[in-house]
Every structure is written in structure tokens, then in C-alpha cells.
Amino acid sequence: MLIGDNLSLSAAHLRKDFGVMQFTSLIVFGLVFLVVPMASSQDLGPTGPSPYDVVEGWHKPFAAEGFAFGGNSGVFAESPNRIFISQRGETKLPTPLPLEFAGYVGSIGINALRDTELRTWQNCLMTVDGNGNLLEVWNQWDHLCEDSDGPGPHRVRISPYDPERRVWVINESRHQIFVLSNDGSELLLTLGEKNVSGSDETHFGRPQDVAFLPDGRVLIADGLDNHRIIITDSNGNYLSEFGGFGDGPGQFNGIHALAIGPDGRIFALDRANGRVQVFRLTNDASGEYHPEVEHIAVWSGFGLPLDLIVNEESVWVSDLRPLKMVKLDFDGNRLYTWNVSNDGPSGYLEIHAFSVDTDGNLYGGDNQHGRTQKLIPKANADPRLLIGPPFVQE
């Protein structure tokens, strides 16, 4: 059973606990390392072809002449006919435009993530329909991406437990998180201070993601600088935190994505450490790590894990080096892996974010090629190899 907001401890008390924890961990680290379950980094499990077909040319360009999509950093399928996409501005195209241009900058050798001199902060958030046609462009909020030195928006998420379906946009460069109304008409919350990195209760250091608990609380992956997971109430007010920099159990080197699973499990992509870490929110936590969070497992052997979806019985991770999709059970055993090709017009450089709609269609955002693609299950696909919708507690 999850612990409610009323049982959250004060920040001062938590920091005191963490100080003791860090000192104690130096003494018992070897023992803890032995007892924490770790998935083998050598066992890759079964591998095979993708169970999906790519819908070529799905993401329809709409930019003004001379521009194309930027890095598609976030994608969230609210429904099969309303898909949110966050992009890191648009990319200026060369003049004259090469004949091989196919509607996305990767087709002419431009890297939307790395060729930053071509970036312009416009059309950073959009929705498209199931055919990839533009529904809305929320350019009224482009100013929330401007005036920062870095890649900008990183994720877009909506809580399945929020009746208002508020839209959370994480901007790593500005060290801020914005919460918008579902129709895009209002900026409801601004968390963090513009272009000010910090590690206290009101600041972030390049936040990366959010995940949502059934009781309304929010987990924030804070992220690339602070290497901590913050627990807040539904309006982003600080309650507690856990984590810290390092490569031991419960420590992080860049938390890139978060997801919630059954029985209070928390899954965190520990990117630079090349692993997934698993925690549990529980009334029965020992308190050695955090008053209401226990560390369960470390799953090693990833190259550069980018995003994940947790279902009722499994976890899917998009990984780089090489680019692949990996299915695991809740013990960290690899059940299936399919490699993602960069060949041809439907190739990927990375699947930075992915989402599944209620019809089983998969959407993958490419932060480097600069586009989002839709993948539909093959007619003869084994249902066990398809990515199901994210876990939602009934």
C-alpha cells in the first residue's frame, strides 16, 4: 500500500537521514552490493525481427519554408487520434535544398540534436492525429523554450489519474517544468527557476522526466545534474527525495526516464551507468535508504537506455549502442530484443521517447533525425512481442 502525502517527512529530516545513509553506505556497501539482485549484463535473451511495420511519411511537415522539424524529444499518445510531440525547436534548412531531402533533416545528413547552430525556438509543442496531420501547434508557449543554452524540452507527459489531463512539459535546459491545461490555453504551473540550476526544494538541475502515482503524487527525475528523484504533491510541492550521484545501488549517473509499475514499483533509467534500477514505495520500508522507498534491484548491461514503458507484467526499454528495443520481466530477465535499423527512409538514429496508444500503435520520437514515426503491429505479430499500454492502477 502506498503512503499518503500526510506521512511525508520534512526536507530537513530527510537530508539528515540521507547524510547518515551515505556515511553508513561506505561501511556496508560491499554487503548491500551482494544482496541486491542484479540481472546479468551478458544474457541478452532471445532476439529477432521487429513485430511492427513503419508507416512511411507519417509525420507530415508543416514548418514554414526554409525550416524542418527539430529533435523530437518527447511523444505521448493521449489517444489514437491525439498524439503530443515536443520538439527542440525547428531546424534551419540549407539553401539550395538538396534533392534528397525527404521531409526530415536526417535525410540530408543534418543531426537535429548536435547541429545546434541551425536550431530556432519555434513550434516546440504540437498535437497530431492518427495519420500524422497537424491538429494544433502550441506556439503561444514557444517563449518557454527561449533564452536557454541547451537542447530545451525533454519530455511531455499526462497523468492517467488526473481528471483535468494536464500536460507536463519538462525543459531540461531552463531547469524548469511547465504544466499546461489540456487545451493549451493556460499555463497552470511553473516549477523551478528559469536558467538557475540548484538542488534544493524549489530548483532543479536539468530535469528529465516525471511519473505519476495513483494518489496524485508526482515523481520528478532530476536528472542529469542532481541525480535524484523528487517526490512532490500533485501541484509540484516538494515532499521528499532519494538517490544521489554514484554507481552503487540506489545511486545514479543521469536519470533519463521514469515509470511506475504494479505494487508500487518505480523503474528509473540510470543512463550513464547503463542500467535500470527498481524501487518500491511501501509502508514497510526499512528506512535505511528512504523512509518510504526501498531499493529492489539493478538491471545492468544496457548501452545508453533512453525511455521505457512498464506494463502489467513487463518492462520495455529503448536502448542505444546499438539501437534496440528490449523486453524484460520484473526480475530483469530479457524476454525479447529487436534491433532498430537506421537504413532506408524509415530508419532511426535513436528512439529518444516512445508511446503506445489504446489501439496498440507505437510512436517513436527521433531526437537526431528530427521526426516522430508511427509503427503498427504486423498482421502476423506475436502479441507477446508487442508493447502494451502503460500500467494504470484501477
Predicted regions and their residues:
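Residue-level detector of alpha-helix boundary/anchor positions
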Residues: L7-S8, H13, F33, L213, ...
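Bacterial N-terminal signal peptides
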Residues: S25-V36
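Sec/Tat signal peptide C-region and signal peptidase I cleavage site
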Residues: P37-S41
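Eukaryotic scaffold repeat domains enriched in small/polar residues
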Residues: Q42-E394
